[in-house]
Amino acid sequence: MATPETTTAIEVLGATQTAVALGWSAGTIEQTYRLYRDGAVVHEGTAIHYVDHGLAAATTYEYTLTCVTSSGESDGVSVSVTTNSAVVLITDRTAEDVYEGRAKGRYNALDFVRVGEAVAYLEERFSTVGISVPVSPKLDWQIDDIPTQAQALHYLEDIEALRGKLLEYRETVSAPDSLTSLTWGQANDIETILLDSEKLIRGIILSYRYYSGRVISGVHALP
């Protein structure tokens, strides 16, 4: 087996509140890639990308990538990345984002993770005002993952569950019926429902403060 090549670069493809996506170039020989986070191995395989999950918000991590063959392990290349401090929602995609291939115009694993983070966050937020929302978002998407029919249905059911609670109090946009041929406008609608849900919760909390005089601290804002 050949001596492992040294990778030339590792690229940050994106980050959310709890996940980081990384990519690198394939070598010219058969080898595996070993990825370390802060000195501990988190992934090893032949793929040239990886999404690391279960991270803390607003935290900086150092990733090091090496190449491995039976002859040994190469020197590593490193990159640092900081996770988002809050859930980020995108509601301003345009047709140009799609046609020009911009990041906002592509719906990928990190979008599924971001939305899942928001759904989990909103479930907790609704519970603070006594409202139960039955959701269970998937948060461990990888870059090559294509949602199965069941996963796509569950993804939209979580959005519809939040929308259902929202419609008891105010109007909002409709959720798409399917992820097949999802348009940029429908992608915006999904995250508008999440943003409107947060606005509703804030309004309930403010009303409760006004009528009861109780002070509720630590209201977290979705950007």
Regions found by a protein language model. Give the residues of each.
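Extracellular "spike/adhesin" assembly and maturation modules
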Residues: 84-223
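Short, flexible active-site loop motifs that bind/organize anionic cofactors or intermediates
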Residues: 10, 40-42, 51, 102, ...
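Recognizes extended acidic, P/S/T-rich segments that occur
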Residues: 30-58, 70-77
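Pro/Thr/Ser/Gly-rich low-complexity, intrinsically disordered linker/stalk tracts
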Residues: 1-29, 57, 69-91
